A protein has these predicted regions:
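Phosphopantetheine-dependent thiolation modules in NRPS/PKS and related acyl-activating systems
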Residues: 1-40, 44-75
Length: 75
């Protein structure tokens, strides 16, 4: 599963609408509760765990991608 697929599934939007520019500011359904769901789904999909401070800072697809890449995951 790709990063875009995880985000689109949790936020209930089209995968084609999810880009690196997508963020908590650009997707109305990406509120604080959905953010937790996004983080949990990413952890499950990629078999990793995010420290709380890092998870809180992942407020855009680009930020999430950077964190995943730092861990050697191409999503």
């Amino acid at each position: 599963m790709t990063l875009e697929e995880v985000v689109s599934r949790v936020l209930r939007c089209a995968v084609t609408d999810v880009t690196d520019e997508s963020s908590t500011r650009t997707i109305a359904s990406w509120d604080s509760l959905r953010h937790i769901e996004v983080v949990m789904e990413l952890e499950e999909a990629f078999g990793i765990a995010f420290p709380p401070m890092q998870a809180a800072a992942m407020t855009s697809v680009a930020a999430i991608r950077r964190v995943l890449q730092q861990r050697g995951i191409e999503a």
